[in-house]
Amino acid sequence: MDSESQKKQRILGIDFGSKRIGVAVSDEERKMAFPVSVIQNTPDALNEVEKIAKDNLATQIVLGESRNYKGEGNKILLSSMKFKEQMEAKGFEVIWEAEFMSSIQAERIQGKNDMLDASAAAVILQGYLDRMKED
């Protein structure tokens, strides 16, 4: 894939939770992240995320890597590892991104509301995009 067509592809950001999955998407230039939706974490969630990715021409997914204060994996990490494997089986490149305190950052920015998980996904994705600019 040439760099021009890769630039037009957006990247999806995911804040994976046991009850809800927050979804964000980058702009075409991969500079800014925007909250898109919050999906209930049901058996159909995988298909919903896949549809959002395809609708946004995203082949890459940045998935929040959930760890505790000591940096150890937690219950959510185990579930998100399974989600990662399932999305990779569908042909997506899935990249881990540390998500420590992303929900708290999102709440500070916008307050608590129905899109909080999507905003946390945008915080995760923006962190990844910012690091890619530095490289």
Q: Residue spans of the language-model regions?
A:
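Phosphate- and other anionic-substrate recognition elements at nucleic-acid/protein interfaces
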Residues: 2-12, 18-135
